[in-house]
Amino acid sequence: MIQTQTYLNVSDNSGAKKIMCISIISTKRKYAKIGDTIIAVVKKASPNKIIKKSMIVKALIIRTTKPLYRKHNNMYISFNENAAIIINTDNTLKGTNIFGPVPRELMNIGFTNLNSTAKLII
């Protein structure tokens, strides 16, 4: 579960390395889970890229350490890190690659463009 002041790794090639959640915009809960969008500030970035340090960005959460329950086969999946990808205001990706696994549940909620950019879909 992601709440405010939580640090997340960035799993795309947009230029940001670490972000910190400052607001959850897709739900009214205190915490966010896989598939929710957040507003974050970039804490660490690589040089000569689009995203710079201390920029305010919109991000989509793709991995959390809290287990995710799958109803169709009664399994729990969990990851070793909290990770997100940077998106534009119209919910398109800023980067061109996604590193690491992406859960299949993101395709069901409207992010079908992740299917072509993700290397591994669980």
Curated annotation (Swiss-Prot):
Keywords linked to the UniProt accession: Plastid, Ribonucleoprotein, Ribosomal protein, RNA-binding, rRNA-binding
GO biological process assignments: translation
One Gene Ontology term, aspect cellular component: cytosolic large ribosomal subunit
Disulfide bond entries: none
Gene3D superfamilies reported for this sequence: Ribosomal protein L14 (2.40.150.20)
InterPro entries xref list: Ribosomal_uL14, Ribosomal_uL14_bac-type, Ribosomal_uL14_sf
UniProt subcellular location: Plastid
Superkingdom classification of source: Eukaryota
Main location class: plastid
Residue runs in coiled coils: none
Gene Ontology MF terms in the entry: large ribosomal subunit rRNA binding; structural constituent of ribosome
Pfam families: Ribosomal_L14 (PF00238)
Role description: Binds to 23S rRNA.
Family statement: Belongs to the universal ribosomal protein uL14 family.
HAMAP family given in the database record: Ribosomal_uL14
Subunit structure: Part of the 50S ribosomal subunit.
Record-given protein name: Large ribosomal subunit protein uL14c
